């Protein structure tokens, strides 16, 4: 967005540092004795979203695979089948004095919504139906919760809107040759869409989809912009 290369490289360095810190164990923070504090749902899902964002920016397949594994682990650790939502703390550490299900936004958007956002990106990229079933289940649960907590669930409304529009940009061929188009699209659409890479030795083009309605092969920035304007995306 800022076209600041120095900021970009410093950010990538910070991401690499986070990856190293969380390589063997995800934790919330250190205490004064530098001991690790147990995690919450948000620690897992925000790290997952960071990983899949790195894939979208850099075509880093290792980050994509790590995100996939981490979201699977998140589901196993936090999903409450009775409430059909992800609870705030790991299931085995439930505290009877604290409600483990928390669906409202606090200082940051709620972890359930961020899981849905990352999960939808992952489904768009991998086409793995197991992610689609989780998306459908959570979106139904969100709709029922919104009726009672509308004023405190704004991030859910935004994420459900992103999910319903489901905008994707798929880059085919030599990804490096499409970087100019990709950088321009990042400025406006990175937050509300999924960027997908399909490397091959064939022709280079972009396909834009919104809610399963897709463009033809678009080979220039002009063609991309014309399509976006024509379809009001």
Model-derived features: positions:
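Glycan-recognition and catalytic cores of secretory/periplasmic carbohydrate-active enzymes
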Residues: 1-233
């Amino acid at each position: 967005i800022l076209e600041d290369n120095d900021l970009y490289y410093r950010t990538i360095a910070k991401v690499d540092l986070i990856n190293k810190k969380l390589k063997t164990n995800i934790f919330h923070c250190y205490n004064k004795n530098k001991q690790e504090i147990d995690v919450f749902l948000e620690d897992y899902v925000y790290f997952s979203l960071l990983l899949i964002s790195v894939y979208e920016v850099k075509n880093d397949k290792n980050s994509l695979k790590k995100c996939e594994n981490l979201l699977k682990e998140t589901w196993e650790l936090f999903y409450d089948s009775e409430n059909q939502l992800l609870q705030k703390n790991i299931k085995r550490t439930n505290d009877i004095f604290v409600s483990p299900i928390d669906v409202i936004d606090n200082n940051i958007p709620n972890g359930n919504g961020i899981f849905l956002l990352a999960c939808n990106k992952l489904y768009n990229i991998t086409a793995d139906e197991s992610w689609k079933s989780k998306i459908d289940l959570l979106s139904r649960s969100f709709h029922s919760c919104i009726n009672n907590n509308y004023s405190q669930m704004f991030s859910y409304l935004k994420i459900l809107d992103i999910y319903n529009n489901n905008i994707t940009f798929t880059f085919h061929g030599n990804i490096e040759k499409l970087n100019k188009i990709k950088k321009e699209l990042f400025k406006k659409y990175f937050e509300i869409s999924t960027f997908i890479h399909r490397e091959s030795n064939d022709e280079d083009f972009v396909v834009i989809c919104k809610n399963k309605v897709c463009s033809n092969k678009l080979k220039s920035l002009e063609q991309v912009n014309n399509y976006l304007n024509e379809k009001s995306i």
